[in-house]
Amino acid sequence: MYKDFYASLKPLEGEIPYAEEERLAASGAPLLSWYRKNRRLLPWRENPEPYSVWISEIMLQQTRVEAVKPYFARFMEALPDITSLAQVDEERLLKLWEGLGYYSRARNLKKAAVCLMEDYGGQMPASRDEILKLPGIGSYTAGAVASIAYDLPAPALDGNVVRVLTRLFADPQDSTKPALRNKYERRLEAELVRRTEERDSYLSAGDDAGEVSTALRSEELFHPGEYNQAWIELGALVCIPGGRPLCEKCPLESLCLAHRRGEEEQYPVKPPKKPRRIEEKTVCLIEWEDTVAIRKRSSKGLLASLYEYVNLDGKKSAAEAAKELGIAEADIRETEDLPDAVHIFSHVEWHMCGRRIRLKRASGYQDKAVLMVCRAQLQDRYPIPNAFRVYTNILI
């Protein structure tokens, strides 16, 4: 009905026809119908308990769904509940997180788990406002957990949803500004509350418990978590970034102002990105027999408290690196040039060259900050960030 109605409208020059609230309300039915037919089967959707929803949402921040799947399975097997997460040793936690990046997410998970044990009896609170008080949880994650796990009418606005809505409304506002996100959260929350109240009124109007029970089992019944996930899924699968969206597959095609104007790729509006800073490094694999030198990074800053291979600023030959590290030529068995590697962070790029330095004796390299560890321990004990993956693969 809505599709036919909006398809008959003519775009108005210089203004958006119809209020955003009306356009949002008209989107609900086709969006949910599409989602129920096209949603992906994901492990965290199988049993949407508060803990698993929380862990998955934190992992999915800045990380692709396919990349998260094996990490989620491994994490849930090792730390299946809030109690085990609160008690885990930090190095063990970081090792489980190794490869996902943005390690502050893992540390905040543990901090939040400790808070849950101390203040909430080891349970995730069934309140968006209370969830929002936990370390590492922002508005999106709080809304996702509250709506998916507890069926509460709380919005969950991530980058996917922002992209869909800015195109739906042809919104010229800067999408990186809090004002736009706050506006959309209010719009979505009002729609969630309206639809949830309609559902509850329908259920309470049932004459007998049997009819109400049947309605509760019906897939046609409105659920806030499903509604939120439908917007996210549409942005991930159809209204995609970095090119032309798949408008011909979109259930909101005839409702979308950007599509009607042929301006899909102009939204969302963002300021130009600042170029990333480039840092050159020489990564040294200093080996003696089956051991390799690693050291722990600072507890603050990039890759805080993780382990790394010895490295130097700038690009240096093996001989130059050995000299700078105080390794005598007489203590070197052999050297080897290793492949170059590039790792991109949000604000900086590391351009690395690798140098292998094999020692004749254990005492050939002296540094109190360095540990000589067995290669096998790189796999099961010490968390080495993905930035050094090329060099870790050489060792294991």
Listing of model-derived features with the role each one plays in the protein:
Residues 2-12, 16-21, 30, 34-245, ...:
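Catalytic cores of DNA base-excision repair glycosylases
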Residues 1-41, 46, 196-221, 236-396:
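Intrinsically disordered, low-complexity, charged terminal extensions of DNA damage-control enzymes
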